[in-house]
A protein has these predicted regions:
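Anionic N-terminal interaction surfaces
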Residues: 1-29, 46-47, 67-70, 77-81, ...
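Short, hydrophobic/aromatic-rich beta-strand segments within well-structured domains
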Residues: 33, 73-74
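Hydrophobic alpha-helical segments, principally membrane-spanning helices and signal/leader peptides
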Residues: 13-14, 34-36
């Protein structure tokens, strides 16, 4: 069995309602995959297929509705659903996800 090849990986809090679900975020040629830590209340893994991604942008994280650090990765799907992750180096994540979506379109994966 071959190990998956990740374009990027790092610690991330996925924003689910009022909870920031801590874990790791992985980007490969097909999807963004969030794997929560075992200590979270919400432990369900979440995968976003790159073919579902309409746009990716860097946005400000909010605390009690107040914009704070510009360290949030917002992924908008073609369905209109928005998924947000608090990450380190959000700008680099945006570039890598955009590049992976473009590469997937070129190769016919998307």
């Amino acid at each position: 069995m071959t190990e998956p090849v990740y374009i990027r990986e790092g610690f991330a809090n996925m924003l689910k309602g009022k909870e920031g679900v801590g874990g790791k975020l992985y980007l490969d040629e097909n999807m963004l995959h969030h794997m929560p830590h075992a200590i979270n209340i919400q432990r369900e893994e979440t995968a976003v297929l790159l073919k579902e991604v309409a746009s990716v942008e860097r946005v400000r994280n909010r605390l009690l509705g107040i914009p704070m650090l510009n360290n949030c990765l917002k992924v908008t799907l073609h369905s209109g659903l928005e998924v947000q992750y608090v990450v380190n180096k959000a700008g680099q994540w945006v570039e890598d996800v955009e590049r992976a979506v473009a590469d997937a379109k070129k190769s016919g994966v998307v």
